[in-house]
């Protein structure tokens, strides 16, 4: 099973999600919507970072993950 890593930086107000190996990061591309895409050397997106992300509570953040079957045409 693939691994997804989620990091929240309270000091930097960023939420970072990796679904590839962070060590494979070669280039970052800002989308203009306060989102930075992290890509490997082949240009494949392996993660993203949401800038100016503020948690609304001091409680630990819960992360829900759900697999969705989009079906085949």
Model-based region annotation:
Residues 1-73:
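Small, basic N-terminal interaction modules of short regulatory proteins
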């Amino acid at each position: 099973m693939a691994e997804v890593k989620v990091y929240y930086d309270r000091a930097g107000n960023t939420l970072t999600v990796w679904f590839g190996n962070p060590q494979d990061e070669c280039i970052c591309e800002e989308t203009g919507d306060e989102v930075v895409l992290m890509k490997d050397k082949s240009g494949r997106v392996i993660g993203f970072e949401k800038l100016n992300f503020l948690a609304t509570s001091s409680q630990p953040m819960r992360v829900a993950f759900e697999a969705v079957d989009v079906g085949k045409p």
